[in-house]
């Protein structure tokens, strides 16, 4: 960006009357309460999900490690989101009558941008790690079960590299000139930001297709193993593959839905262009933080899937143990059938 363009952006220090009214409105204050509530609920379920993974784990060790890292990453992302929203509301109270102090200079938001977008990209690319984990589990079963932590760490490193590359393409060398309504808004000069969002969406769609196919293969394989194998270890491994693949499918669908909500919503807002005021655009956009919603979905899937699986296991055990009564009755029945 040339110096003239930077100077032009820096000159737009004061919020317009329409934007100023929006940033100090009741709707924006409600948005802060709403997003903060989402974040606080996600904290509770993240704690419950981590406890479930550590105490009542139904996933493989590789999948569990990936999920725990993703949960910890989501804590940072959610905290950044809530901190910026609370700070923006505080600013709207403090400078309600001074529109020239309502906005943030992009250069003052560097730390927030780093935390928000890096953790956001990391959350998105978790679907790649989980999908790859399922593929290795299905096609290289023996290697998978003997090298689970190596596989998980390798996939997390790749996930981190994808995150850093995406952040580099979107923001490296981008001028931080200009002003933004909230500190997590990307700089106006970040022209590659939309391209990276498109790539992220395509990655999630591909991962959903691959994971769905892997889930189908896992179900098919589990049915075959139930017919021909009496090994408890082999049967449990097949059941674990189904449970994990199903959970990953659910998570990717929810993640994709949340991100598409933001992507489609923002694209529609941009298409409307001049037909929509800046204040209305900002108000609607603040209700569309897809990754924040996705970071609530992840612990919900883990926690409730764990509870459901444990309940189903107890039910099956109860059916099996009550089918023939106690051991004495079963032996007596066998003796009678042998006479």
Curated annotation (Swiss-Prot):
Protein's UniProt keywords contain Transferase: no
Keywords: Membrane, Transmembrane, Transmembrane helix
Record membrane topology: Multi-pass membrane protein
Main location, first listed in the record: membrane
Entry's Gene Ontology cellular component terms: membrane
Recorded superkingdom: Eukaryota
GO biological process: sensory perception of chemical stimulus
TM annotation in the entry: 33-53, 110-130, 150-170, 199-219, 250-270, 284-304
Subcellular compartments: Membrane
InterPro entries linked: 7TM_GPCR_serpentine_rcpt_Sra (IPR000344)
Keyword Nucleus: no
Classification via Pfam families: 7TM_GPCR_Sra
One GO molecular-function entry: G protein-coupled receptor activity
PANTHER family xref list: G-PROTEIN COUPLED RECEPTORS FAMILY 1 PROFILE DOMAIN-CONTAINING PROTEIN-RELATED (PTHR31582:SF2), SERPENTINE RECEPTOR, CLASS A (ALPHA)-RELATED-RELATED (PTHR31582)
Family assignment from sequence similarity: Belongs to the nematode receptor-like protein sra family.
Protein name, per record: Serpentine receptor class alpha-22
